[in-house]
């Protein structure tokens, strides 16, 4: 039995949006789900969906009606949205878990203590085909929380301990610019290297904002996102939003050394490596100049490096007899996002 889909008219009557923005156009949501071709990944009668900060939940109801997953849980604790969800979905298969998605304990309580939502574990040789995470991180805390989630993918913890769990995440367009920045981009930073290292992330949809051109033409051509009107979001004012499809990839990166190398070099992201490399430790320039096989690599700036090149430099760093104690390093990993 289908569930009621909240209308634009009813959703815009919610008094507080708590600084978040939501796409409220059922036709565009349907286009998005068609584009994602989720049936090729998931066994729908076995799929469990965890929807974080669902807000007015129009997208949630549409997903439920199209795919009819085994379980659909909405996690939200914001009072006006909680009331709206209860008014619209009481007595349906849509389950509300009234906790804050920001808190780590919300997940441990839900999964381990209360057993309200218990995903199975799968091997990391493919995307988990019975567990999907959806989220809206367009509010003030969104970018920082998204960076934490990317780190969790790399560390294979949080919800990613169950396998390679796909995430469909709404973020501010500016955040999408940052995490999708390619080597050579002026805004290339640690967050985009993390995204490249641990995920295959695609731009699924974005608004027709005046800043759309900040995405590279090659990215727009390759990802072919759905472009929707800024009028289809509520609230209409403020910064535009984008939808990212985050597919975790399996990796065997030496995380501690890789983290040290990438964050130190990217502080000097526009400085050629032959100079910036000394930031890894005293004597670094001489050591790396001797060990790096492709001497042209040392002429590159950190912002121009691919993750593969960072991994290569990390392997050299790891074999350095006089490398510094990386555990005595106190540089903030997200310093470039502040």
UniProtKB/Swiss-Prot annotation:
The keyword Hydrolase does not apply. It holds the Pfam family RrnaAD. It comes from the Eukaryota. The keyword Secreted does not apply. Keywords: DNA-binding, Methyltransferase, Mitochondrion, RNA-binding, S-adenosyl-L-methionine, Transcription, Transcription regulation, Transferase. The gene is MTF1. Belongs to the class I-like SAM-binding methyltransferase superfamily. rRNA adenine N(6)-methyltransferase family. One of its GO terms (biological process) is methylation. GO terms for cellular component: mitochondrial DNA-directed RNA polymerase complex; mitochondrial matrix. Its EC number is 2.1.1.-. InterPro entries: KsgA/Erm (IPR001737), Mtf1 (IPR016586), rRNA_Ade_diMease-like_C (IPR023165), SAM-dependent_MTases_sf (IPR029063). S-adenosyl-L-methionine binds at residues 23, 76, 100, 136. Mitochondrial transcription factor that confers selective promoter recognition on the core subunit of the yeast mitochondrial RNA polymerase. Interacts with DNA in a non-specific manner. It is found in: Mitochondrion. One of its GO terms (molecular function) is methyltransferase activity. It is an enzyme of class 2 (transferase). PANTHER family: DIMETHYLADENOSINE TRANSFERASE, DIMETHYLADENOSINE TRANSFERASE 1, MITOCHONDRIAL. Its main location: mitochondrion. This is Mitochondrial transcription factor 1. It comes from Lachancea kluyveri (Yeast).
